[in-house]
Amino acid sequence: CEQRYFGFLNRFHMFKPYYMLVFHHPPFEKRLKYCKYDHIIFECEYYYKKMCRMFPKQADKMSLCVWGPDLSFYPQIDLNFDEPILISNGRTNRDHNLLVDAATYAKVHTVIVSDEKHIPSNFTDDNQYVEIYKQNVLNDKKMVELLCKCSIMVIPTFPSEELLGPIGNTSFCDATALGMPCIVASNTLMAENVMKFRLGLVYNVGDLNDLTEKITYCREHPDTLKEMSRNIKKFGRENDSLKFAMVIKNIVDSFY
């Protein structure tokens, strides 16, 4: 793709503009080995530290900055944690079959956003706890309206050997903007911050029993959810899109 091509040219001084890249889709090793960048931004602390160790000579050209939401797009609301409603509003790499089973066993109202082609195969219309919100055409405003009726964001991904790329980032941004505690799979990039800053709960990816336990915990501990909601709102304010833009601006200014 273009960024690898330009990076390769830059390595041999055949690309004159300053070249900065935001790395979000791993693997990164080959790009750092064969290409040259004037600066690299990582969205995940795990990969940032790993690449600094693997390529110490380039570490001074690497930065860490969490991608955040545009807070002006979202309303400020009070969420209901006494009768929590879960939602998974992503489509890429989502293990919604697992979520259907876990929500049913935990007996917690759960909304799964899906188009006609990707409705979970184990979902049935008579399920008392899981509902499918069909959205064949993306509509951000309607999505925010739906999110405001829910209280907990779930990001259930399929198992993988390494941490996934930016899978779930949009859902996580929605959650940080609205103050929704998260239940995320252990192989997501945001799992680290969810644990570190108490933004929600992390379940072992692919583990039905663990996901069921985490959902049940949310139902039984509304006060803990309120605390997590305050934490994730604070995290969103401290890591919004304006901060990300300022990091990029400061790096660009340093080139001149």
Where are these regions (language model features)?
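Conserved catalytic-core segment of nucleotide-activated headgroup transferases in glycan assembly
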Residues: F81-M143
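Acidic anion/phosphate-binding donor-loop and adjacent secondary structure
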Residues: K49-R53, S63, G68-E83, N97, ...
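A short, well-ordered alpha-helix in the C-terminal region of glycosyltransferases
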Residues: D210, Y217, T224-E238, N250
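Nucleotide-sugar-dependent
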Residues: K141, I155-C173, V184-E192
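A short alpha->beta transition loop at the rim of the catalytic pocket in nucleotide-sugar-dependent
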Residues: S151, G179-P181
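A short, active-site helix/loop in glycosyltransferases that binds the activated sugar's phosphate group
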Residues: F28-E29, D38-K61, E192
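Conserved acidic donor-binding segment of nucleotide-sugar-dependent glycosyltransferases
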Residues: K196-F197, L201-L208, Y217-D223
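C-terminal alpha-helical cap of glycosyltransferases
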Residues: E238-Y256
